[in-house]
Structure formats: C-alpha cells, structure tokens
C-alpha cells in the first residue's frame, strides 16, 4: 500500500477503470480508482476489497484424477515421460471458466505417441478451458491413455489428506483463486480542511474472469456480509428472538407460493426482474443458472423445481419467500403460515 500527495478536486463519489490489458491468456490486469473519499475511508475500502478479492471469489478447477493403474502418485507409467505426480501438478495448473456448482466429471482419453494438452480434456458443456495449450503429459509410445477427472467450483485452497488410493484415484490440492494478486494505493488531494483521498486498486486475474468481473463479485460478497445487520434493524428483532425462532416444515413454502399465484392479478410479473428483488448473490446466481429471470419465471416453478437447482438450499428458499413477501403488495398473513 502506497500513499502520495496529488492535486485533485472534490466530486460525487465515483469509480472507473483507468487501465485494462491482457498480458496473456492466463494473466489479465485492471486498474481502478474510487474517489473522492474522506480521510481513512480509502484504507477501509482497500483492505476489505483486497481480502474479498483474494479469498471470496469462486473459481473452477480439477480436484481429482483417476488413473487406470498407478500404485502410488510417485510411480511412472510405461510410455509416458512424466510421473503420476508431475501429471497431477500439470492438471492443478489448468485454468477453467464456468458457472457450474457442485462436482462434475471430465476425462482424457487419447492414443500415443503425442503431447497431451488441456485441449484434450473432454469437459461438460458448461465448462471451458482458458488456455488450451497448457501441457499435461507426453506419450512417447503408441499406448492408450485415459484419466477420469472431477471438476469443482469453490473458493480458496482445497486440501485433502493423502491416502493410498487402491483404485488409482488421487486428490489434487487445487487452488480456487481466480484473482492472482491485488494491490491498492492511496493518494491525498485537496488543500487545508478540504483534503480527500483517492483509492487506486490493481487486480491481476488468471483469465477465468476479468478484473472488472472480479471486482463486481467481491463487492457483491461484501454487501451480502452486511445484509443480515440491515435486515435485523428493519425487522426490529433481537438475537434472543432469532435464537428461539421456529422453523416449519417444507410444505409451507409451496402453499404460500400457490397462494401468491392466486393473488397476482394486476401485477405485471413478467416486468419484474429478479435483479430488483435484493436477493443475495448466491441465491441470485442459482436462479439465473436455472434461466429464472423474472418474477413470472419464479412463480411458474414448484418447490421441487427450485430444490433441484444446483447448490440451491433451504436457506435460499426461505430467503426468496421473505423477499417476495417484503416487496409484493399482497397480504398473506391471513393464512397464518410463517417461516
């Protein structure tokens, strides 16, 4: 973090991208500014954004590989230049781009002699490779070589205890961190009592998303962290009240949605987009992946449809209903149903 004195003027708080470039397929760079900020605010925003960018952004990577016959990870396979461990390390470096949630299967099945690169990975439709030229192995003889892979979207470091996997399956200590580095610097501007600060933020990513996309996702995650405090203040509830709150059975959600559909006359549901419902980024992304874009799309789904969405949880179901009840001018209290 760097501080410098520069000349500047006070304006309404705003941000913009002042530099953006692609150094390689796996290295994107972006530089952003936010100004004007009061003294101390730039540090607050800079520290929070840096931590969110490095620790809260989700990435997709290969987490497991299964070989046909390999007694241990340090063994070699006839006709292959690399050892099993070297192949695992190469797979760890593969950069993937996707919006999937949960575990997906992929595979490699080729015949030598030839070089194996990331382009040879057979992926599910929702996943794409950022750099198809990334090396995996070199087959030196005319052998059939097949690997079963597992792909997962997560955040941070994924570590798993090493074991003697009898079936030839080995975990890969993947790093789901699309943001490679973040720097911020603070510049002071103005004179006398009118001093303000300008925050400069530099972001490097691995190509699976742009720095601008990473900044947007990190900001959404930070907002989601503070939403519970805002909701608690609006509802006027205490922690003791929340602790003793009763959680009813699943079927109440479906009853309430059914009732809402019956009372939707006069509301242009196809003109109300889920972007307007103040959903958390997690719930919002789940619905978007299921092609649910408007309130009409949402109300056309049954509870079973929603629960089949990848990574959709009971907490998301409750959050959706609470949001609908908050924003729609429909009195459902007469049903005496509550979450």
Swiss-Prot record:
Its EC number is 2.7.7.6. GO terms for cellular component: chloroplast; DNA-directed RNA polymerase complex; mitochondrion. Belongs to the RNA polymerase alpha chain family. InterPro entries: DNA-dir_RNA_pol_insert, DNA-dir_RNA_pol_RpoA/D/Rpb3, DNA-dir_RpoA, RBP11-like, RNAP_asu_C, RNApol_insert_sf. It is an enzyme of class 2 (transferase). It catalyses: RNA(n) + a ribonucleoside 5'-triphosphate = RNA(n+1) + diphosphate. Residues 264-339 are annotated as: Alpha C-terminal domain (alpha-CTD). Residues 1-233 are annotated as: Alpha N-terminal domain (alpha-NTD). Its main location: plastid. Keywords: Chloroplast, DNA-directed RNA polymerase, Nucleotidyltransferase, Plastid, Transcription, Transferase. The gene is rpoA. In plastids the minimal PEP RNA polymerase catalytic core is composed of four subunits: alpha, beta, beta', and beta''. When a (nuclear-encoded) sigma factor is associated with the core the holoenzyme is formed, which can initiate transcription. It is found in: Plastid, Chloroplast. The N-terminal domain is essential for RNAP assembly and basal transcription, whereas the C-terminal domain is involved in interaction with transcriptional regulators and with upstream promoter elements. The keyword Transferase applies. NCBIfam families: rpoA (TIGR02027). This is DNA-directed RNA polymerase subunit alpha. GO terms for biological process: DNA-templated transcription. DNA-dependent RNA polymerase catalyzes the transcription of DNA into RNA using the four ribonucleoside triphosphates as substrates. The keyword Transcription applies. It comes from the Eukaryota. GO terms for molecular function: DNA binding; DNA-directed RNA polymerase activity; protein dimerization activity.
């Amino acid at each position: 973090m760097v501080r410098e004195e520069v000349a500047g003027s006070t304006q309404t708080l705003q941000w913009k991208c002042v530099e953006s470039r692609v150094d390689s397929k796996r290295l994107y760079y972006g530089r952003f500014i936010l100004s004007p900020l009061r003294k101390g605010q730039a540090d607050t925003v800079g520290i929070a954004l840096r931590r969110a960018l490095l620790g809260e952004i989700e990435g997709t990577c290969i987490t497991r590989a299964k070989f046909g016959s390999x007694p241990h990870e340090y063994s070699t396979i006839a006709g292959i230049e690399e050892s099993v461990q070297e192949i695992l390390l190469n797979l760890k470096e593969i950069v993937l781009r996707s919006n999937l949630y949960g575990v997906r299967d992929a595979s490699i099945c080729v015949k030598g002699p030839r070089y194996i690169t990331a382009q040879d990975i057979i992926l599910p439709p929702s996943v794409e490779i950022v750099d198809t030229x990334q090396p995996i192995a070199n087959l030196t003889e005319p052998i059939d070589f097949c690997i079963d892979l597992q792909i997962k979207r997560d955040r941070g470091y994924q570590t798993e205890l090493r074991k003697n996997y009898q079936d030839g399956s080995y975990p890969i200590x993947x790093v789901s961190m699309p943001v490679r580095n973040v720097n911020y610097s603070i510049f002071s501007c103005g004179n006398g009592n009118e001093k303000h600060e300008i925050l400069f933020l530099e972001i490097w990513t691995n190509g699976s998303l742009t720095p601008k996309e990473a900044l947007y996702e990190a900001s959404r995650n930070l907002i989601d962290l503070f939403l519970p405090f805002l909701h608690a203040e609006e509802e006027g509830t205490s922690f003791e009240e929340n602790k003793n709150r009763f959680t009813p059975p699943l079927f109440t959600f479906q009853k309430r949605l059914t009732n809402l559909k019956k009372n939707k006359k006069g509301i242009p549901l196809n003109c109300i987009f889920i972007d307007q419902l103040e959903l958390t980024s997690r719930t919002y992304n789940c619905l978007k992946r299921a092609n649910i874009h408007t309130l009409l799309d949402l109300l056309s789904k049954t509870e079973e449809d929603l629960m089949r969405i990848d990574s959709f949880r009971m907490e998301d179901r409750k959050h959706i209903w609470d949001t609908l009840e908050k924003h729609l001018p429909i009195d459902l209290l007469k049903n005496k149903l509550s979450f």
